[in-house]
Amino acid sequence: MMFPGLLAPPAGYPSLLRPTPTLTLPQSLQSAFSGHSSFLVEDLIRISRPPTYLSRSIPAASLSPPSQEAPAALADSGTSDLGSPGSGSRRGSSPQTALSPASEPTFLKFGVNAILSSAPRRETSPALLQSPPPKTFAFPYFEGSFQPFIRSSYFPASSSVVPIPGTFSWPLAARGKPRRGMLRRAVFSDVQRKALEKTFQKQKYISKPDRKKLASKLGLKDSQVKIWFQNRRMKWRNSKERELLSSGGCREQTLPTKLNPHPDLSDVGQKGPGDEEEDNPGARLAYHAPADPRHLLEGPLPASPAHSSSPGKPSDFSDSDEDEEGEEDEEITVS
């Protein structure tokens, strides 16, 4: 009878002869790690393993904050440790210098390895805390993100804001131009003023072609000549109204009407013989009625004031004069 336990080697013996899996790798994995590509499946598996499987010793000088060359150096040391059979003794001899999970180049602060690891988390490196903060706006109530929307023209000269061209330029453009409706007062020279005054004495209301011709002759704009005539007529009308009111007239005589759209007030205050006859109709009737009716039959009839007046000036008593002449003719024929 044979006892299998006696012939079979103990269970722990093959494990002593067999190399540790963490120390030696198959030929395929060794060729994979020998390459520099970091996108292979083996590299991703090695990176995703817990730190206890890939714990390796590093010198004390490497405990300083990791730099840009640290991941490459750690990767090279890791491959050399995995390939060397004596790395286990070094790992066992220096447990204090073992790399903590927080200092791994691929360590995630909120990853599964960080949550399940029993090692205390390291605080943020003082060198990282001493990094200069991002530059913000000079004023305490504005952050750096609002700086492009603020121009230096809205703040005093002591502000350190650099003006950005093309940012909200419409308020500045509108501020420099005069508002619509505010026209600058034109300054006329003596020659221009004399020419305008001479033309105004000839005609108070200048026509559009004459106005354009006068503007081109004097080197002015058509609107300037138009406004000058408007202001001059208003000044002239006010002076004539004062003269008319002082002489006992009414203001309506100076205003334009449908029959006389352009009243001429140059003769205000100066009454001619026709005006005296209109003011005294009794004298006009006495002037037309002769003392002897026979003289009317022998001689021609005198002209009526309506016919003697100028044709350009309308007379308010033209209808009444014609009626009175008809009555006088009837009386003359009857007598």
Curated annotation (Swiss-Prot):
Its main location: nucleus. Residues 181-240 bind DNA. InterPro entries: H2.0_Homeobox_NeuralPatt (IPR051662), HD (IPR001356), HD_metazoa (IPR020479), Homeobox_CS (IPR017970), Homeodomain-like_sf (IPR009057), HTH_motif (IPR000047). Keywords: Developmental protein, DNA-binding, Homeobox, Nucleus. Residues 318-335 have a biased composition (Acidic residues). One of its GO terms (biological process) is ventral spinal cord interneuron specification. Disulfide bonds: none annotated. Residues 83-95, 299-317 have a biased composition (Low complexity). The keyword Nucleus applies. CDD domains: homeodomain (cd00086). It comes from the Eukaryota. SMART domains: HOX. PROSITE patterns: HOMEOBOX_1 (PS00027), HOMEOBOX_2 (PS50071). GO terms for molecular function: DNA binding; DNA-binding transcription factor activity, RNA polymerase II-specific. GO terms for cellular component: nucleus. It is found in: Nucleus. Residues 58-102, 240-335 are annotated as: Disordered. Could have a role in patterning the central nervous system during embryogenesis. Has a key role in regulating the distinct phenotypic features that distinguish two major classes of ventral interneurons, V0 and V1 neurons. Regulates the transcription factor profile, neurotransmitter phenotype, intraspinal migratory path and axonal trajectory of V0 neurons, features that differentiate them from an adjacent set of V1 neurons. Belongs to the H2.0 homeobox family. This is Homeobox protein DBX1. It comes from Mus musculus.
